[in-house]
Amino acid sequence: METSQKHYFDDADEALSPETSRPNFVKLAPVFSMTPETSLHPLSDDGHDTLRGLEEWFSEHGGTAVATDYLEALLTGWAPKIPARAWGLDAPKLIAWHSKSEMNEVFLASEARTRLATALGELKITGSISPAGLAEGRKGLNALRPVPQIPRGTRHWPYRDEVPSALADIGNVLDSAPIG
C-alpha cells in the first residue's frame, strides 16, 4: 500500500506486488521483481527479510530514512563478519577466498544478497537508489559474479549455471535505476 507519495510498502500478509511497488521498480525489474521463487532472486530468502526490515525502517523514519543506515544497523549484528578486504577482491582472489571454506561462500553470498536487496528495496520503496545504496548493491553484485567459477567440488549450488544471466539482469537494473 502507498503510505505517502514517496514510499511504497507491501502488505505484510501479501507477496511482492506491482501495486505496492514504485513504478520505476516495476518497469526496471520485470524479469525478477514479482517472482521470488529461487535463491537467485534478490528479494527471496535473505532479500525478503531485508526488504521487510527496510520497509519498517522507512515507515519508522519517514522522510529521514536512509537505506544504507538500515543496512549498517542490520549487518552490525551479524556474525561472522566478512572482512572488509573481501569486498574489494578481484575475481581470482575472491574465488580463492570462497574456496577456502564452504562457509566463506555461504556467509559472503548471504551478505552480498542482503546488500543487493537493500539497493533494490530502496528502488522498490522510493523509486530511486541513493549513490551509497548503489555502491552497496554493486558490492553485492561483484561478490556474487565469481560464484559460477568456484570449483564444483566445494559446493554444488543447483542454480550455479543460471547465475551469470541472473546477475546480468540485476546489474542492468542497477545501471538503469534513477539515482536519488
Regions found by a protein language model. Give the residues of each.
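N-terminal leader/targeting peptides and immediately adjacent processing regions
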Residues: 1-58
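Amphipathic, membrane-active segments
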Residues: 56-77
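Ligand-binding pocket scaffold of soluble enzyme catalytic domains
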Residues: 61, 136-140, 152-155
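Acidic, Ser/Thr- and Gly/Pro-rich intrinsically disordered linkers and low-complexity segments
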Residues: 75-105
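Charged, low-complexity interaction regions
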Residues: 62-66, 124-131, 153
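Amphipathic alpha-helical segments within extended alpha-helical solenoids and repeat-rich scaffolds
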Residues: 74-81, 138-148
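Eukaryote-biased recognition of C-terminal alpha-helical segments
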Residues: 145-180
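Amphipathic alpha-helical elements of HEAT/ARM-like alpha-solenoid repeat scaffolds that form extended
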Residues: 51-52, 105-124, 160-165
